[in-house]
Amino acid sequence: MSDVIIYGGAFNPPTIGHLKIIEYLVNKFPNNKIIILPTNNFYKSKDIVSFDHRKKMLEEMCKDFIDKIEISNYEQTLDKYYGTYYTLQYFNHPLFVIGADSLETIHKWIKYPNVVTENRFIVFPRGNININEVINNNEVLLNNKSKFIICDDFIENDISSTEYRVNKEESYISKDVLKYIKDNNLYN
């Protein structure tokens, strides 16, 4: 069986940016099991909507290819925020999707450097961050360079959930997610 790919995030709400990454993964890694993993409600954000709402928004956004992915309840079962390292252990060290911005701060993650040395990553561009430079300037990353798949061919969009929550810009989210948000009176 091919590797499992985990794409985790708050998805508060899931945006067009998240959708493009999921579509890229489905197309680029058609033989891999792709698991979308919303964080639990103990995650750092104080204005996070419930896990159930975020999972349902993901289901709405991904309904055209829901048969090619799994949206996991795993983090909903946890009693606190444990960090990425423990999640990757639970899923038996899958490929883990991160943005270049997360790669820049990976040295601050729980169980660093083990989270790097024991796992593999799919890295997406973000902002003007030079991914190879980040790797080359960190000894742990450099010594584990073979564990990073860099998605140089991904066309980045700079849409964030935070920007949607602040600006309520409807073009940042899919029509299905927008309808769900309005129907459930979220992010007011």
Give short role names for the model-derived ranges.
Residues 1-188:
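Nucleotidyltransferase catalytic core that binds NTPs
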